[in-house]
Amino acid sequence: MKYKIEKNTVQETLILPLYSRKLCTELYPNLYRDETAVHLIDQIDYDFSEAEENSRSLMQRFGALEVAMRQNDLAWEVRNYLKTHPSAAVVNLGCGLDNTGRACDNGRCKIYNLDFPDVIALRQQLLPAGEREQNIPCDLKDPAWFDKIDASGGAVLFASGVFYYFLTRQVRDLVQGMADAFPGGVLVFDAANRTAVKMIAKTWLRTAKIKDVGAYFAVSDAKSELSPWDSRLQVSSRGYMMGYNDLKDPSVSGFFRFLAKIGDNGMKMQIVKIGFGDRQ
């Protein structure tokens, strides 16, 4: 039986990124594979005709490449942390229907998927928690969820496309709280500069009726801007389109590589990595 998704619901906002990940898998098979997205799309009763039509446009295809690179970069950082902390907590912040935690599973880590209760309710139906995995309903801004994470073997926390919707002070408070709760842990997330965040905001601020885009989290130089938040933070960043992959694949045109350079250098689209001190 297929799971029906209605238009203009919270669930619909989860379906479109899922469709994007399926599109990435089809367009850039050598660069990205998300079998979960392909499988889930088949289980869902939803009118994808508009998404399918949009998928033919040049910018939609480049957007799919952006999604692919972001997910790959974050997964690379998760796997890299697990090499030295094999029993770590792998924490997907604002998980939606993303399965990166399970894709990085080494057979020993503990996987936590966090999102709002209505999102987790849908996830439980479509992606029920597996072995060593928990789906946790929460508000990321409320630190009560810290206590639900077993970080005795370390913690790698990651957020994909989440912090654009946070105020700068909310991200700072969350990062400082994580530094207390997860010493020796790492937080990895995507970010962009003010110009890019304003472009992202155009699509959702209208409906949210929020005027002050400037209060929302944006970063140009991660190390110099975020390090002063707390002396325990070790901040680094890489471009998220080409910082981990040169994109020299037949599926990626020269024009898309050119756009990727503009994204990384002009828009400062980046993967930010924050280490919370060292676990002795």
What kind of region is each of these model predictions?
Residues 1-91, 95-138, 151-152:
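Rossmann-like AdoMet
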Residues 143-152:
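Short amphipathic alpha-helix with an adjacent loop that forms part of the alpha/beta core around
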Residues 157-158:
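A conserved beta-strand element that flanks and buttresses the S-adenosyl-L-methionine
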Residues 165-178:
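A short, conserved alpha-helix within the catalytic core of class I
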Residues 178-194:
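Conserved beta-strand signature within the Rossmann-like core of class I S-adenosyl-L-methionine
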Residues 198-213:
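Short, glycine-/aromatic-enriched active-site segment of Class I SAM-dependent methyltransferases
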Residues 213-240:
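Short alpha-helix
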Residues 232-258:
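Conserved catalytic loop of SAM-dependent methyltransferase domains
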